[in-house]
Amino acid sequence: MNKKTIAMLGAGSWGTAVAIHLAKIGHKTLLWSHNPQHVALMAEQHSNPAYLPGIPFPENLIPSDDLIECVQSADYVIIAVPSHAFAEITNKIPKPTQGLAWLTKGVDPASHQLLSQLVASRFGVDFPIAVISGPSFAKEVARFLPTALTLASNNTNYQKKMHQLFHHDNIRVYLSDDLIGVQLCGAVKNILAIACGISDGLGYGANAKAALITRGLAEMTRLGLSMGARQDTFLGLAGVGDLVLTCTDDQSRNRRFGLLLGREVPIPEAEHQIGQVVEGKHNAAQICAIANKNKVEMPICEQINALLHGIVHAQEAVNNLMSRPAKEE
């Protein structure tokens, strides 16, 4: 593929890491942040000390705080803001010429919609979109360590272009047309990572964590199937791959947040210690609302949501799960 200009909207750790990857393989990459001071610091230090310290920017990675200019200058636009800011960004930007891709994992907190539904209401149901997900920590992608991702799209031509844009020796990209499944995996796995962190924070050991991962996978699969997703998606990179990674490795901010809660650190202090958005905290209520609407039982997610809203404490949430009536697996 000829080298392109990419607008990466969102300069957190994940958006920055993917921007570094795209710039390293030759694409001019515009890294947008809403904060002019953050942009000035990145431009001065040629890195992102706030969210991805110690990894220098390639020369063709350019920080910017001009949202409209970034979009209008780019061949391809990728959104990497937290889910609660996604609607605001899509409402502000002009319609991208090629389509719109995003790295964001979550659902819209105001409407409980999938992000693809928000984009369809803004730019039309036939507008090309792509969701990029899978087991991937920012530092490892930025350091060119081997990574495999899933790229789901509603448009095969746009999907092919995005595949060519991302695919490289260190990143293998698998294709999917299951937008619903890939998006749900990305949202639910963060809630389950909080649960696994809490379990480890309470000192419950490997058996409990394995049970949470396995039963959590069953929960997210049930929800996905009720909404038209495909079961194989949940057994792939975006599903079990990302779930296992996020639940077991302390690079996961959702898992670290859960660890703190399991050690009885108050929620505001735990968020402060993490220092970045904890998507699982923001998405728990939304996922439970979607599950309730679709009449799907998600007991692990429900207990985490109750804990986050002060209804139960960590030990009580575990007791509630363990005392549920016996049932077939």
Swiss-Prot record:
Give residues annotated as binding sn-glycerol 3-phosphate.
Answer: 105, 134, 136, 189, 242, 252-254
What InterPro entries does the entry give? 6-PGluconate_DH-like_C_sf, 6PGD_dom2, G3P_DH_NAD-dep, G3P_DH_NAD-dep_C, G3P_DH_NAD-dep_N, NAD(P)-bd_dom_sf
Q: Which domain of life is it from?
A: Bacteria
Which reaction equation describes what this protein catalyses? sn-glycerol 3-phosphate + NAD(+) = dihydroxyacetone phosphate + NADH + H(+); sn-glycerol 3-phosphate + NADP(+) = dihydroxyacetone phosphate + NADPH + H(+)
Q: Name one GO biological process term.
A: glycerophospholipid biosynthetic process
Q: What sort of enzyme, by top EC class, is this?
A: oxidoreductase
Q: Where is the active site?
A: 189 (proton acceptor)
| Stored Pfam families | NAD_Gly3P_dh_C, NAD_Gly3P_dh_N
PROSITE patterns linked: NAD_G3PDH
Protein EC: 1.1.1.94
Give binding positions for NADPH: 13-14, 34, 105, 138, 253, 277, 279
Where is this gene product found? Cytoplasm
- Main location, first listed in the record: cytoplasm
What UniProt keywords apply to this chain's record, in alphabetical order?
Cytoplasm, Lipid biosynthesis, Lipid metabolism, NAD, NADP, Nucleotide-binding, Oxidoreductase, Phospholipid biosynthesis, Phospholipid metabolism
GO terms for molecular function, please? glycerol-3-phosphate dehydrogenase [NAD(P)+] activity; NAD binding
- Which Gene Ontology cellular-component terms appear in the entry? cytosol
This protein's pathway reads: Membrane lipid metabolism; glycerophospholipid metabolism
Ribonucleoprotein found in the keyword field: no
Family indicated by similarity = Belongs to the NAD-dependent glycerol-3-phosphate dehydrogenase family.
Report the protein's function: Catalyzes the reduction of the glycolytic intermediate dihydroxyacetone phosphate (DHAP) to sn-glycerol 3-phosphate (G3P), the key precursor for phospholipid synthesis.
- What name does this protein carry? Glycerol-3-phosphate dehydrogenase [NAD(P)+]
Gene (UniProt) = gpsA
